[in-house]
C-alpha cells in the first residue's frame, strides 16, 4: 500500500487523483492533503472522505474552521503546512498537483528523504530543473511524470536503450484557437479562450494551451525529466489528442502511447507503476472510426516553442524567468488588462531583453521569479 501526500488536492489534477484512489482503495492511503485555492467545500469533503492525518491550507479562516471541526487532525498553514505534508514520516509518495513554484521547497525536502515524486507540476522542472535533477541523482529519488505527454514518453522509454533514441515528440491539441485566422486572433475573448475543444482544465493552463506556451514549458520539462542530451525534442499539433507522446528511434521506428484525452490515464499509471490495474475509465473504442491528424506547429503564430528552445540553449535563470513572466501575463489577460495577442508579444519582448544569469539555488529561483513578475506587470 502506498502512503500519499497530495499537494493541491482541490485542483483539477488533485481531484482526479482522488478519483483514482477512490477506485483502488486497497492500494492507497491518503496521509496528507494540501489545498491552495478557495475550494473550501470540496476540501472539507475530501477530509471527511479520506481521513488524512495532516492537512494544510493557505487561508487563516479555513485553518481555524478545520481545526475546530477535525480536532484529531494536524492542521497547518501556508508553506509550513506544505513542508509538513510532504515530509511526513508515513508518506512515501508525493503527488505534486499544484501550480506555480510555491511547493518547490517542500518537494525538494521530500526528495531528500527519498520519497517518490509523482509530478504534475511542470513549473517545478521549468524553474528548477537543474536543481531537481541533481537532488534526484544524489538521493536516488524516483520521479514519475503525471503530465499526459511526459507520462506517455516515460512509458515509451521504459526498458529501452536511450542511446538509440533519436527524437521525443510531444503532441498538442492546438488549443481552442487552432483554426482561427490571424485577424480573428486579434479579437479573441476570454470566453473564446476558455472553451477548450478537448480538455477540461483550469483557466491558467487553458490559456497556456491557447498560446502553446504550455507546450513550450513541456519541451523544457521533457529535457530535464529524461536528460537525453543527444535526442531532439519537438512538438506536433494533433487535434484529436488520442496520441499523447511519441519516441522515434534511430532506425525510424516510432513508439507511442494512445488513450482518450483524460488525465485519469496518466495519473493511474504514475500511481500504480510498474503494475497495471483495471481502470474505472474506458479506453479507445476501436469499433468506431477514429481519425489521427498531425500538423507542424506554426511557429510564426506561436513563438512559444521558439522561446522554449531559447531556454534550453541559455539555461540558467531563463527557465524561471519565462515561467513567472508568463504567469503574470496570463493573469493580466484573465482580468482583461491586456488582450490575448499581447501575451505572446510581451513575453517575446521580455525574453529578448532579458540577461540570463546563473541559477543554482532556490534563493536564485525565487529572486528571478520575483524579478520576472515585476517586469511582466509593468510591460
UniProtKB/Swiss-Prot annotation:
Residue sites binding Mn(2+) per the record: 147, 149, 218
Residues noted as binding NADPH in the record, renumbered to the chain: 10-13, 39, 121, 123, 202
InterPro entries, sorted: DXP_reductoisomerase, DXP_reductoisomerase_C, DXP_reductoisomerase_N, DXPR_C, DXPR_C_sf, NAD(P)-bd_dom_sf
Family, similarity comment: Belongs to the DXR family.
Keyword NAD: no
Keyword Oxidoreductase (UniProt): yes
UniProt pathway: Isoprenoid biosynthesis; isopentenyl diphosphate biosynthesis via DXP pathway; isopentenyl diphosphate from 1-deoxy-D-xylulose 5-phosphate: step 1/6
Cofactor: Mg(2+); Mn(2+)
Catalytic activity: 2-C-methyl-D-erythritol 4-phosphate + NADP(+) = 1-deoxy-D-xylulose 5-phosphate + NADPH + H(+)
The gene coding this protein: dxr
Cysteines joined through disulfide linkages: none
Any one GO BP annotation for this protein: isopentenyl diphosphate biosynthetic process, methylerythritol 4-phosphate pathway involved in terpenoid biosynthetic process
The name this protein goes by in its record: 1-deoxy-D-xylulose 5-phosphate reductoisomerase
Function summary: Catalyzes the NADPH-dependent rearrangement and reduction of 1-deoxy-D-xylulose-5-phosphate (DXP) to 2-C-methyl-D-erythritol 4-phosphate (MEP).
Amino acid at each position: 500500500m502506498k502512503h500519499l501526500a497530495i499537494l493541491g488536492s482541490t485542483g483539477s489534477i488533485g481531484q482526479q487523483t482522488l478519483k483514482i484512489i477512490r477506485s483502488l482503495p486497497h492500494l492507497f492511503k491518503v496521509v496528507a492533503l494540501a489545498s491552495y485555492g478557495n475550494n473550501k467545500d470540496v476540501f472539507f469533503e475530501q477530509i471527511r472522505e479520506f481521513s488524512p492525518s495532516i492537512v494544510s491550507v493557505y487561508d487563516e479562516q479555513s485553518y481555524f474552521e478545520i481545526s475546530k471541526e477535525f480536532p484529531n487532525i494536524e492542521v497547518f498553514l501556508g508553506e509550513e503546512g506544505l513542508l509538513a505534508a510532504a515530509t511526513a514520516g508515513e508518506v512515501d509518495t508525493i503527488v505534486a498537483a499544484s501550480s506555480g513554484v510555491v511547493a518547490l521547497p517542500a518537494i525538494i525536502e521530500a526528495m531528500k528523504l527519498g520519497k517518490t515524486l509523482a509530478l504534475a507540476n511542470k513549473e517545478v522542472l521549468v524553474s528548477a530543473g537543474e536543481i531537481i535533477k541533481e537532488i534526484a541523482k544524489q538521493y536516488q529519488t524516483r520521479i514519475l511524470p503525471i503530465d499526459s505527454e511526459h507520462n506517455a514518453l516515460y512509458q515509451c522509454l521504459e526498458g529501452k536503450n536511450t542511446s538509440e533514441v533519436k527524437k521525443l515528440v510531444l503532441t498538442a491539441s492546438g488549443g481552442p484557437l487552432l483554426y482561427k485566422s490571424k485577424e480573428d486572433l486579434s479579437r479573441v475573448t476570454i470566453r473564446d479562450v476558455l472553451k477548450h475543444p478537448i480538455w477540461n482544465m483550469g483557466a491558467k493552463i487553458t490559456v497556456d494551451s491557447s498560446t502553446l506556451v504550455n507546450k513550450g514549458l513541456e519541451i523544457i520539462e521533457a529535457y530535464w525529466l529524461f536528460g537525453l542530451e543527444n535526442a531532439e525534442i519537438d512538438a506536433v499539433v494533433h487535434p484529436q489528442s488520442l496520441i499523447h507522446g511519441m519516441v522515434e528511434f534511430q532506425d525510424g521506428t516510432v513508439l507511442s502511447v494512445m488513450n482518450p484525452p483524460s488525465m485519469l490515464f496518466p495519473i493511474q499509471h504514475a500511481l500504480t507503476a510498474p503494475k497495471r490495474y483495471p481502470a474505472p475509465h474506458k479506453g479507445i473504442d476501436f469499433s468506431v472510426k477514429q481519425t489521427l491528424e498531425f500538423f507542424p506547429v506554426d511557429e510564426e503564430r506561436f513563438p512559444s516553442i521558439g522561446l522554449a528552445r531559447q531556454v534550453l540553449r541559455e539555461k540558467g535563470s531563463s527557465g524561471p524567468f519565462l515561467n513567472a513572466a508568463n504567469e503574470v501575463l496570463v493573469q493580466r489577460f484573465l482580468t482583461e488588462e491586456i488582450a490575448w495577442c499581447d501575451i505572446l508579444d510581451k513575453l517575446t519582448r521580455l525574453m529578448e531583453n532579458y540577461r540570463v544569469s546563473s541559477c543554482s539555488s532556490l534563493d536564485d529561483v525565487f529572486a528571478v521569479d520575483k524579478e520576472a513578475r515585476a517586469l511582466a506587470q509593468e510591460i
